[in-house]
Amino acid sequence: MFNEPTTYYLIKGILQAENDSKQRLGQKFAESLRLKPGPSGPDDGVDGSTCFLGRKIHFQSKLSANFLSKDEARKYYSDIKYHMADISIMLAGVGYKETFLDRLFGHPDINSVVIHLLTLQDLFERSNKFQNALKDLPTLENLDNILRFP
């Protein structure tokens, strides 16, 4: 349930966009976070990265209109390990299936990585999950600025 009807329509509009538009939005998010952007096109599992307080941070945006499944969790875990992240922030369009969570957190070494699984709703409504992620990457505060209207 959305706290504000406007949030629903903003998210709906984003999720109905073409894939290249959603990819550009993910890159805009990374840019707004002052992260080193991932490559255009196939992004090698990273939309942005940086080091903050000596910890390597990985940011990935998957703005799918569907809940992310275990297949996405497999890719995400692999990307976290490949990029040697200490902290990883995933921004999903609508959320995560239980199978995603089971698969991701079923890896015995995953607890060594701080993971923040956010949604567009978390971003727009500045949820508790969003507030917790701010502690690890204060520039997350900038994300909603690219979506605000004057």
Give the ranges of each region predicted by the language model:
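Mixed-charge (Asp/Glu-Lys/Arg
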Residues: M1-P150
